[in-house]
């Protein structure tokens, strides 16, 4: 007799855990500044997962890699290949840590939105979600990428780097300048839009048909989350390579 009420309560609990609220934020007041606490908390969790996993996997490195060490060596080799392909064989080395950090942080952040029950942690306002579910995170990552490719170009070419803005003709100066503004915009909004849309679709499906239909969508979300991390890292490496090679 009590099976139906129990099932309904269970489904309601699952829906609450899976929910995503948009537009509500929780802030810390530090001095005269408001700090976006939600993004900081979830970002710290992601960083802790990355550092903890790396520390456990390589705490006792072996000449013949074990499972954890072998996995991280494979990830490093993958990141090196991406960097080498986009930046160039002679220049890619110093940029592997930056590209790798971007890829791993975005990848784990995206997956945390699907796998970690952030809703369990209650906040006075808003709720926790994947760091990349917030436009502040994606804009910050895109601006870091912009700083990186400007730095790469200026380091390689000096002030001659700015000559690319008048190539192949000075008439294209406004378009070439605008291109540098659209790069971070496209990077940030592509990542933010895809991750937010993925989580909202899962929430809607859970509310309509709990337990069954959302599962394949969640697996698809994990796949697309990984692809988005790869796209962001690949484009960041491509922009850095382009800034050192010249205008294309």
Swiss-Prot record:
Keywords: ATP synthesis, CF(0), Chloroplast, Hydrogen ion transport, Ion transport, Membrane, Plastid, Thylakoid, Transmembrane, Transmembrane helix, Transport
Bilayer topology: Multi-pass membrane protein
Cellular localization per UniProt: Plastid, Chloroplast thylakoid membrane
GO CC terms: chloroplast thylakoid membrane; plasma membrane; proton-transporting ATP synthase complex
Tree of life domain: Eukaryota
GO molecular function: proton-transporting ATP synthase activity, rotational mechanism
Main location: plastid
Name the UniProt record assigns to this protein: ATP synthase subunit a, chloroplastic
Natural source organism: Nuphar advena (Common spatterdock)
């Amino acid at each position: 007799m009590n099976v139906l009420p129990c099932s309904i309560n269970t489904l309601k609990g699952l829906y609450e855990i899976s929910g995503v609220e948009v537009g509500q934020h929780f802030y810390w007041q530090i001095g005269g500044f408001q700090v976006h606490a939600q993004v900081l908390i979830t970002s710290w969790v992601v960083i802790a997962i990355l550092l903890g996993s790396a520390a456990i996997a390589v705490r006792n490195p072996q000449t013949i890699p074990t499972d954890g060490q072998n996995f991280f060596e494979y990830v490093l080799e993958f990141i090196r290949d991406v960097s080498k392909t986009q930046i160039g064989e002679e220049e890619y080395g110093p940029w592997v840590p930056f590209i790798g950090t971007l890829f791993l942080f975005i990848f784990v952040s995206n997956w945390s939105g699907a796998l970690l029950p952030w809703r369990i942690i209650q906040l006075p306002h808003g709720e926790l979600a994947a760091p990349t579910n917030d436009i502040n995170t994606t804009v910050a990552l895109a601006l870091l990428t912009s700083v990186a490719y400007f730095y790469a170009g200026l380091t390689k070419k000096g002030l001659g780097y700015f000559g690319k803005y008048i190539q192949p003709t000075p008439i294209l100066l406004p378009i070439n300048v605008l291109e540098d503004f659209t790069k971070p915009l496209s990077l940030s909004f592509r990542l933010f839009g895809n991750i937010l849309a993925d989580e909202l679709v899962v929430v809607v499906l859970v509310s309509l048909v709990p337990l069954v239909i959302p599962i394949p969508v969640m697996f698809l979300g994990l796949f697309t989350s990984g692809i988005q991390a790869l796209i962001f890292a690949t484009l960041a490496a491509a922009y850095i390579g382009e800034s050192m090679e010249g205008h294309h």
